Regions:
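Substrate-binding/catalytic subdomain of NAD(P)-dependent oxidoreductase enzymes
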Residues: 37, 47-136
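Rossmann-like NAD(P)H-binding beta-loop-alpha module
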Residues: 1-57, 63-71
Length: 136
Protein backbone atom coordinates (compact mmCIF):
# COMPACT_ATOMS: atom_id res chain seq x y z
CA UNK A 1 0.00 0.00 0.00
CA UNK A 2 1.33 3.47 -0.82
CA UNK A 3 4.32 2.47 -2.93
CA UNK A 4 4.88 -0.69 -0.91
CA UNK A 5 5.03 1.12 2.42
CA UNK A 6 4.18 -1.34 5.20
CA UNK A 7 1.42 0.39 7.15
CA UNK A 8 -1.33 -2.10 7.97
CA UNK A 9 0.70 -4.30 10.35
CA UNK A 10 2.19 -1.33 12.25
CA UNK A 11 -1.29 0.17 12.56
CA UNK A 12 -2.62 -3.09 14.01
CA UNK A 13 0.25 -3.16 16.49
CA UNK A 14 -0.24 0.50 17.48
CA UNK A 15 -3.99 0.22 17.84
CA UNK A 16 -3.63 -2.14 20.79
CA UNK A 17 -2.02 0.55 22.95
CA UNK A 18 -2.82 3.84 21.23
CA UNK A 19 -5.63 5.80 19.69
CA UNK A 20 -4.99 6.91 16.12
CA UNK A 21 -6.93 10.11 15.51
CA UNK A 22 -5.75 10.94 12.00
CA UNK A 23 -4.30 9.22 8.95
CA UNK A 24 -3.03 11.34 6.08
CA UNK A 25 -0.66 10.81 3.21
CA UNK A 26 0.19 10.13 -0.38
CA UNK A 27 -1.00 6.57 -0.89
CA UNK A 28 -0.70 6.28 -4.68
CA UNK A 29 2.80 6.17 -6.11
CA UNK A 30 1.68 6.52 -9.73
CA UNK A 31 -0.02 9.89 -9.25
CA UNK A 32 2.85 11.10 -7.08
CA UNK A 33 5.30 10.13 -9.84
CA UNK A 34 3.20 11.89 -12.47
CA UNK A 35 2.75 15.10 -10.47
CA UNK A 36 6.49 15.19 -9.73
CA UNK A 37 7.25 14.76 -13.44
CA UNK A 38 4.82 17.57 -14.28
CA UNK A 39 6.64 19.90 -11.89
CA UNK A 40 10.26 18.95 -12.56
CA UNK A 41 10.00 18.58 -16.33
CA UNK A 42 7.17 21.04 -17.05
CA UNK A 43 5.10 18.26 -18.60
CA UNK A 44 1.39 18.18 -19.25
CA UNK A 45 -0.85 15.51 -17.77
CA UNK A 46 -0.92 13.38 -20.94
CA UNK A 47 2.87 13.43 -21.26
CA UNK A 48 3.37 12.47 -17.61
CA UNK A 49 0.80 9.69 -17.96
CA UNK A 50 2.51 8.33 -21.06
CA UNK A 51 5.85 8.13 -19.23
CA UNK A 52 4.19 6.42 -16.24
CA UNK A 53 2.61 3.91 -18.62
CA UNK A 54 5.87 3.29 -20.49
CA UNK A 55 7.59 2.57 -17.16
CA UNK A 56 4.79 0.24 -16.09
CA UNK A 57 3.57 2.44 -13.23
CA UNK A 58 0.18 3.20 -14.80
CA UNK A 59 -2.15 0.85 -16.65
CA UNK A 60 -1.98 1.35 -20.41
CA UNK A 61 -5.61 0.48 -21.18
CA UNK A 62 -7.37 2.22 -18.30
CA UNK A 63 -5.28 4.30 -15.88
CA UNK A 64 -8.48 5.57 -14.22
CA UNK A 65 -7.93 3.70 -10.94
CA UNK A 66 -4.83 5.81 -10.39
CA UNK A 67 -5.56 9.15 -12.07
CA UNK A 68 -9.21 9.37 -10.99
CA UNK A 69 -8.29 8.63 -7.37
CA UNK A 70 -10.08 5.28 -7.03
CA UNK A 71 -6.95 3.42 -5.89
CA UNK A 72 -6.16 6.05 -3.25
CA UNK A 73 -9.81 6.05 -2.18
CA UNK A 74 -9.81 2.29 -1.63
CA UNK A 75 -6.58 2.54 0.36
CA UNK A 76 -7.84 5.27 2.68
CA UNK A 77 -11.06 3.25 3.11
CA UNK A 78 -8.98 0.31 4.36
CA UNK A 79 -6.88 2.47 6.68
CA UNK A 80 -9.93 4.35 7.94
CA UNK A 81 -11.71 1.07 8.64
CA UNK A 82 -8.77 -0.02 10.79
CA UNK A 83 -8.74 3.28 12.68
CA UNK A 84 -12.52 3.49 13.16
CA UNK A 85 -13.09 -0.15 13.95
CA UNK A 86 -15.88 -0.55 11.41
CA UNK A 87 -16.18 -0.88 7.64
CA UNK A 88 -15.75 2.33 5.64
CA UNK A 89 -16.93 1.99 2.05
CA UNK A 90 -15.04 3.73 -0.79
CA UNK A 91 -18.26 4.90 -2.44
CA UNK A 92 -18.94 7.04 0.65
CA UNK A 93 -15.62 8.91 0.41
CA UNK A 94 -15.47 12.19 -1.55
CA UNK A 95 -12.78 11.58 -4.17
CA UNK A 96 -11.17 13.65 -6.88
CA UNK A 97 -8.19 12.48 -8.88
CA UNK A 98 -5.55 14.35 -10.85
CA UNK A 99 -6.92 13.89 -14.38
CA UNK A 100 -7.87 17.58 -14.69
CA UNK A 101 -4.53 19.02 -13.50
CA UNK A 102 -2.99 21.27 -16.14
CA UNK A 103 0.42 22.84 -16.69
CA UNK A 104 -1.21 26.14 -15.65
CA UNK A 105 -2.33 24.58 -12.33
CA UNK A 106 1.19 23.34 -11.65
CA UNK A 107 2.64 26.77 -12.52
CA UNK A 108 0.12 28.53 -10.26
CA UNK A 109 1.09 26.24 -7.38
CA UNK A 110 4.77 26.92 -8.03
CA UNK A 111 4.18 30.69 -7.88
CA UNK A 112 2.77 30.10 -4.39
CA UNK A 113 5.84 27.97 -3.55
CA UNK A 114 3.55 24.94 -3.37
CA UNK A 115 3.03 21.63 -5.15
CA UNK A 116 -0.12 19.70 -5.99
CA UNK A 117 -0.41 16.20 -4.52
CA UNK A 118 -3.18 13.63 -4.24
CA UNK A 119 -3.73 13.33 -0.48
CA UNK A 120 -5.90 10.75 1.21
CA UNK A 121 -6.94 11.57 4.77
CA UNK A 122 -9.15 10.48 7.59
CA UNK A 123 -9.72 12.58 10.69
CA UNK A 124 -12.58 12.13 13.13
CA UNK A 125 -14.65 10.16 10.60
CA UNK A 126 -14.15 12.86 7.97
CA UNK A 127 -12.56 10.98 5.09
CA UNK A 128 -11.43 12.45 1.77
CA UNK A 129 -9.21 11.63 -1.15
CA UNK A 130 -8.57 14.85 -3.04
CA UNK A 131 -5.91 16.99 -4.63
CA UNK A 132 -4.24 19.28 -2.15
CA UNK A 133 -1.92 22.24 -2.38
CA UNK A 134 1.10 21.64 -0.15
CA UNK A 135 3.78 24.18 0.69
CA UNK A 136 7.27 23.09 -0.26
Amino acid sequence: MGGGTPIITPMHQCLAANVISEVEGIVNGTTNFMLTKMVRENLGFDEALKIAQELGYAETKDPGDDVDGRDACRKIAILSSLVCGHQIYPQNIPTRGIRDITVADVAAAERLNCVIKLIAWCKSLSIHCVMSLLSR
